[in-house]
């Protein structure tokens, strides 16, 4: 005998299967319209939610690209801050009174250091790296200032009395906090 079904057997097999249950009552046209309108409203809601999700995803991606562009140089800029500090120290090491007595070679060297420091600071600011304000008398802000000492000074209590190392920001982030001494007020 073969395993293949004969045409008569297929009809017998199909006869044993119950046909799908038909709804007991058929929908009226009005009920069908109401049901289809509800499905349409549900689908429209789903589409609106998907469009809102798509828009939010696009905005989030744009924001992440913008932040990546701004903060991509953060580590490199932080490494350059010590170069800026050293150039400033080199310039501060020579008092103004002694600058007049320099030889031509010394004046050229000093001019080169000044130009290098200026160009470095210009390049940093061009890329959004800016100094943190930390002048004596300014209000101490723990978000951008690091207090390394408290000293009596003519400045009001809680304000900056002295700047030890300049701070820098890139965008909204503090790249390096300014190291300052905070005033305790005038000495009694």
Swiss-Prot record:
Any one GO molecular-function label of the UniProt entry: protein homodimerization activity
Record-linked InterPro entries: GrpE, GrpE_coiled_coil, GrpE_head
Main location: cytoplasm
Domain of life: Bacteria
One BP annotation, GO: protein folding
CDD domains with a match to the protein in the record: GrpE (cd00446)
Gene Ontology, cellular component aspect: cytoplasm
Region: Disordered, residue numbers: 1-24
Record keywords: Chaperone, Cytoplasm, Stress response
Gene3D superfamilies in alphabetical order: 3.90.20.20, Head domain of nucleotide exchange factor GrpE (2.30.22.10)
Subcellular localization, as worded in the UniProt entry: Cytoplasm
Similarity remark: Belongs to the GrpE family.
Assembly with partners or alone: Homodimer.
Role according to the record: Participates actively in the response to hyperosmotic and heat shock by preventing the aggregation of stress-denatured proteins, in association with DnaK and GrpE. It is the nucleotide exchange factor for DnaK and may function as a thermosensor. Unfolded proteins bind initially to DnaJ; upon interaction with the DnaJ-bound protein, DnaK hydrolyzes its bound ATP, resulting in the formation of a stable complex. GrpE releases ADP from DnaK; ATP binding to DnaK triggers the release of the substrate protein, thus completing the reaction cycle.
HAMAP family: GrpE
Protein name according to UniProt: Protein GrpE
Provenance organism: Hyphomonas neptunium (strain ATCC 15444)
């Amino acid at each position: 005998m073969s395993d293949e079904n004969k045409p008569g057997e297929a009809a017998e097999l199909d006869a044993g299967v119950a046909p799908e249950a038909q709804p007991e009552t058929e929908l009226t046209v009005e009920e069908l319209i109401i049901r289809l309108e509800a499905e349409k409203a549900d689908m429209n809601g789903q589409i609106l939610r998907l469009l809102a999700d798509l828009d939010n995803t696009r905005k989030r991606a744009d924001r992440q690209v913008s932040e990546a562009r701004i903060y991509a140089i953060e580590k490199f800029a932080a490494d350059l801050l010590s170069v800026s500090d050293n150039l400033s120290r080199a310039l501060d090491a020579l008092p103004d009174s002694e600058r007049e007595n320099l030889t031509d070679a010394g004046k050229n060297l000093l001019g080169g250091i000044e130009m290098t420091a200026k160009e470095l600071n210009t390049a940093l600011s061009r890329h959004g790296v800016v100094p943190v304000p930390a002048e004596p008398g300014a209000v101490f802000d723990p978000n951008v200032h690091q207090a390394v000492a408290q000293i009596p000074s003519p400045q009001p209590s809680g304000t900056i009395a002295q700047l030890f190392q300049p701070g820098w920001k890139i965008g909204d982030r503090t790249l390096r906090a300014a190291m300052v001494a905070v005033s305790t007020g005038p000495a009694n």
